[in-house]
């Protein structure tokens, strides 16, 4: 009979995916306030900062040349062009955090999530849906950040983005923010209680109790 050994800690990778305006960023900020142990992966982007955003907090804001340098140097785990701007996830921070046993949270688009899955097959995708396209349009307009033609372009793209929801393990319908946040917290908690996660985080205890490794 094989038993669990003292394996190196390995954290979970959570990916929050959504079309623009579904409430992804607000949910991620609220989740981090609720659970500071989560490590937010700070993506690089060539888009301009939105009101209230700070470089190095929500995103690392870079120009096209710097983004190209990072991409060409293979320093990005994934990258994609979304609504005319480039987004990418630095590789080192995720590797270091998961090796140290920390859970990592990525706020990402479906293209990036697909690439992350190639590197981390056990990554958990959480797709956030709006309650309706009409509500999505209302939220985009209420943000007051985009011109009408930009909003129209985002709405046009939303259908294609939503079509990739089946690629995620979980789906949250963000109709009531407090309910959606509770559901997001529950997903994180449930993932941490999986046998595979508990076996790594509590390897010594499992070994002492004689719990066999999962096959």
Curated annotation (Swiss-Prot):
Intracellular or extracellular location(s): Cytoplasm
Reactions catalysed according to its record: GMP + ATP = GDP + ADP
Keywords for the protein's UniProt record, in alphabetical order: ATP-binding, Cytoplasm, Kinase, Nucleotide-binding, Transferase
Record-level Gene Ontology MF annotations: ATP binding; guanylate kinase activity
Family annotation (NCBIfam families): guanyl_kin
Role noted for this protein: Essential for recycling GMP and indirectly, cGMP.
Name this polypeptide is given: Guanylate kinase
Organism this protein belongs to: Bordetella pertussis (strain Tohama I / ATCC BAA-589 / NCTC 13251)
Lineage, opening ranks: Bacteria, Pseudomonadati, Pseudomonadota, Betaproteobacteria, Burkholderiales
Gene that specifies this protein: gmk
